From Swiss-Prot:
Binding site residues for Ca(2+) 2: E149, E185, D188, D190
Signal sequence segment: 1-19
GO cellular component labels: cytoplasm; extracellular space; nucleus; plasma membrane
Family to which the UniProt record says this protein belongs: Belongs to the hedgehog family.
Protein name: Protein hedgehog
Covalent lipid sites (Cholesterol glycine ester): G257
Organism in which the protein naturally occurs: Drosophila grimshawi
Site location (Involved in cholesterol transfer): D303
Entry-linked Pfam families: HH_signal, Hint
EC class name: hydrolase
Length: 479
């Protein structure tokens, strides 16, 4: 809870107390008046003073109210949240500075046809193509279409493209009241865009603002990134180019967020251990709510599959650290202007952003390092350990244990039952005996038995991923 909210609640409490006090004094005044009237008719006896009775009758009600108010304040103050971030959490959403793109900049800084961006071409769609029925028209009063052909082709696009365009139109009207989004090109059936183009599949749009103010285009590109377009390019001073993944692309679902098995975590002993060999109960280097390095216990694996091929984002820092992680995974990003930490999807991290990296020169503290390069690679195997802190330091880079949902605090709250279950299990003496007996009976390390126990998504994580589409707004999900 922030200071303004606490101050407001205490102000309300003070005002309530004042009103109750005034009410009591008014009641006392009425009692005095009645007492004087009665004293003129009958003499005052030595029985209990009516003012004391009134005060006694009033006090429990005021005490009860104050008790309830204090309980409310305690409940609000004890909700889980990171003191330095993230940008989106359970409480009031923090305003985030949005920086316009510069001319020729693309987000992400990958080839448009890579899996980490809009993905490969799937083939030209014309009116006779079977896939033409998958294109949908967009009619929205907040969006203007140039439609030079006069055929309505510019209104045709994939469902995903339509979805992102509607979100962008709302952002444009909020950013510049009275200005609308202008679509100059969408699906192209006349092949005006060269040999290869996502315009031919209805997966790309060329946009501008209705007032044609070129000074707005850098911010327009940034708003397109925030709206969820998979690849945005400030390609020209006259317009912005945006594209999306195919509706049939398996990469859209992002059912998990993981690291590679060969990536390493640091144990409490100081040794480095590959994530593919981690076991439940290992204590690994993590990050607490204040951004400090701490050791935290691994309580489960949300996903673990050593054979699955996956596309990863690689972040290279100026200190030599390299983090390989799936696009939907949350990464801690340091905001030097606001001196705060945000949790950002890996494929939204850009060059010149800052991530937290373990600095051996300062005794293992987490220090910001600049991202020099962002790339996309294919690797075999995925591992997603969950620590009690909800964070983990992998290859010396601090990251979240969560993915898909943009709110670190909400994701951490959602896994609270698993943390509680892990705590209850640790209290069972039989479990410790069982573990010790297994260690004595088997000469193989504990990690091998763990590897055999789980292959794939954890049932609880899988349930949360399925529910998210029904309970969370789309802007909070990695789509």
């Amino acid at each position: 809870m922030d200071n303004e909210a606490v101050s407001a609640l205490w102000s309300c409490a003070s005002a309530t107390c004042l009103s109750l006090d005034v009410k009591r004094h008014c009641s006392d005044a009425n009692v005095d008046s009645q007492a004087r009237t009665q004293s003129q008719a009958t003499p005052m006896t030595n029985e209990t003073d009516p003012r004391k009775l009134r005060h006694i009758a009033h006090t429990p009600r005021g005490s009860c109210f104050m008790t309830l108010l204090l309980l409310l304040l305690l409940a609000l103050n004890f909700r889980h949240a990171h003191s330095c971030g993230p940008g989106r959490g359970l409480g009031r959403r923090r305003d985030r500075n949005l920086y316009p793109l510069v001319l020729k900049q693309t987000v992400p800084n990958l080839s448009e046809y890579q899996s980490g961006a809009s993905g490969p071409l799937e083939g030209v769609i014309d009116r006779k193509s079977p896939k033409f029925k998958d294109l949908v028209p967009l009619y929205n009063s907040d969006i203007l279409f140039r439609d030079e052909e006069g055929t309505g082709a510019d209104r045709m696009m994939t469902k995903r493209c339509k979805e992102k365009l509607v979100m962008l139109a709302t952002s444009v009207m909020n950013e510049w009241p009275g200005v609308k989004l202008l679509v100059t090109e969408s699906w192209d059936e006349d092949h005006h865009h060269g040999e290869q183009s996502l315009h031919y599949e209805g997966r790309a749009v060329t946009i501008a603002t209705s007032d044609r103010d070129q000074s707005k285009y850098g911010m327009l590109a940034r708003l397109a990134v925030e709206a969820g377009f998979d690849w945005v390019s400030y390609v020209s001073r006259r317009h912005i180019y945006c594209s999306v993944k195919s509706d049939s692309s398996s990469s859209i679902s992002h059912v998990h967020g993981c690291f590679t098995p060969e990536s390493t975590a640091q144990l409490e002993s100081g040794a480095k251990k590959p994530l593919g060999e981690l076991a439940i109960g290992d204590r690994v280097l993590s990050m607490d709510a204040k951004g400090q390095a701490v050791y935290s216990e691994v309580i489960l694996f949300m996903d673990r599959n050593l054979e699955q091929m996956e596309t990863f984002v690689q972040l290279h820092t100026d200190g030599g650290a390299v983090l390989t992680v799936t696009p939907a995974h949350l990464i801690t990003v340091w905001q030097p202007e606001r001196q705060t930490l945000d949790f950002v999807f890996a494929d939204h991290v850009e060059e010149l952003n800052y991530v937290l990296v373990v600095d051996d020169a300062t005794g293992g503290e987490l220090r910001p390092q600049r991202v020099l390069r962002v790339s996309s690679v294919r690797r075999r195997g995925v591992v997603a350990p969950l620590t009690r802190e909800g964070t983990i330091v992998v290859n010396s880079v601090a990251a979240s244990c969560y993915a898909v949902i943009s709110s670190q605090s909400l994701a951490h709250w959602g896994l609270a039952p698993m943390r509680l279950w892990s705590t209850l299990q640790s209290w069972l003496p039989a479990k410790d005996k069982l573990r010790s007996s297994k260690v004595q009976e088997k000469s193989t390390p504990k990690v091998n038995s763990t590897a055999q126990l789980q292959n794939g998504l954890h049932w609880y994580a899988n349930a949360l991923y399925k529910v998210k589409d029904y309970v969370l707004p789309q802007s909070w999900r990695h789509d």
